[in-house]
């Protein structure tokens, strides 16, 4: 019984370590909606649509965004 519990503990620890490693390798963990990309959003002063990022204070870097507007508690980032 003790060996089985020890083995379960080792497997659980290994799973946690590998899961944490995968999260560290990720460039960014966005709350970007939609299976094919972000949900569309529209700002009052823009003609085209932007990308809706949920629960963020600013647009993430590395995606080429140059402007934004707040759709509380989310942010709409441009250009698409």
From Swiss-Prot:
Disulfide bonds: 41-76, 43-69, 59-77
Tissue: Weakly expressed in the ectodermal tissue from the distal and proximal tentacles, body wall, and oral disk.
Compartments (UniProt record): Secreted; Nematocyst
Biological process (GO), any one: regulation of blood pressure
Role noted for this protein: Blocks Kv3 voltage-gated potassium channels. Reduces blood pressure.
Family affiliation: Belongs to the sea anemone type 3 (BDS) potassium channel toxin family.
Protein name: Kappa-actitoxin-Avd4i
Origin organism lineage: Eukaryota, Metazoa, Cnidaria, Anthozoa, Hexacorallia
């Amino acid at each position: 019984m003790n060996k089985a519990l020890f083995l379960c503990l080792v497997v659980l620890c290994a799973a946690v370590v590998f899961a944490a490693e995968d999260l560290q390798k990720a460039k960014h963990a966005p709350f970007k909606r939609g299976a094919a990309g972000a949900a569309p959003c529209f700002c009052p002063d823009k003609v085209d649509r932007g990308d809706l990022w949920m629960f963020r204070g600013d647009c993430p870097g590395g995606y080429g965004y140059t402007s934004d507007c707040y759709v509380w508690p989310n942010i709409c980032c441009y250009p698409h």
